[in-house]
Amino acid sequence: MVAEGLCQCYIRRMSTGGPHGAAPDRSCLARDTEGRSPCKNCQGCTQGAADPIPIRILMADSDVEQAPSVSVLPRNKILILAPAGKAYQAEVIRDLFNIEASESDRIVRDVKWSNKYYEVDLDLYIDSYESLQTWGAEFCSDECADLRDVVAGIFLVFEETEDAETFQQLIEDCHFTDERVLVACDLSSAEHPASLERALEVHDVALVRWRERGTNELGEQQGRERVRELLDIHPWSERMLRMHASTAAALAELDPLQADIPLDSVVTRIKQARERYLEITDVHAADEYAARIAHELTEQLLPE
């Protein structure tokens, strides 16, 4: 796997800045078909199995190019991204996952995400940027296609509106074809134009004011609870999920007619309805539209 192409020397330098100096050499990725050869740049460390680091990888080695796709890895990686020199990621990780991440952490493995229905293991990737535009150009490049494939979600933690606007373009440039948990977590208290939220929603990016609580005028959760909700409803691969006993029993008793309803069509319908709702300027008309959509979905999901 390409993941094995990341030598332990490279992983150490990404995590600690040593032993070869503070600046990691991103080309330290050589491997042979056995996954155990010394890396060309270090000539001393050996390859070991490791998950991909969410930064640009130089695919210059022919055997790296010919290695099987990293997509065989589970898509359970959450990339948490923030400006360099800030500790924003630590706050989000603490509030959302109830764990402490140090400044030197780059990967936090086997983080359990659990609700009353299921449990799933996630890996957190922690990265930062000097320029989000430059970072995005690397991450969205063809060389990082396999890495993007294992990322289930990207959380941008920001204070500057310009970063949220750049994030919108970044997601567009990545051309994701499958659903991801995409969140722009705003730690500031500044007001953003409604056009920004709509522009992000076009690319399925949720704009979340991290420190807000409760629900908004649409009855939707805000702040960290909104992000928890997005993680809960994400369609994780069945082979990753561990259903709680009560959930498994309920699924076993589900009416086969209801079980045949494609969930993705329902989710798409809800997203389209939300976009249309936000475009309606008349409050009364918007409420009528919301009530009609709710009735239609109820008829579809719970037929008499």
Swiss-Prot record:
<keyword id="KW-0160">Chromosomal rearrangement</keyword>
<dbReference type="GO" id="GO:0030674">
    <property type="term" value="F:protein-macromolecule adaptor activity"/>
</dbReference>
<dbReference type="InterPro" id="IPR034627">
    <property type="entry name" value="Irc6"/>
</dbReference>
<comment type="similarity">
    <text>Belongs to the IRC6 family.</text>
</comment>
<dbReference type="Pfam" id="PF10199">
    <property type="entry name" value="Adaptin_binding"/>
</dbReference>
<dbReference type="GO" id="GO:0016192">
    <property type="term" value="P:vesicle-mediated transport"/>
</dbReference>
<comment type="function">
    <text>Involved in gross chromosomal rearrangements (GCRs) and telomere healing.</text>
</comment>
<protein>
    <recommendedName>
        <fullName>Increased recombination centers protein 6</fullName>
    </recommendedName>
</protein>
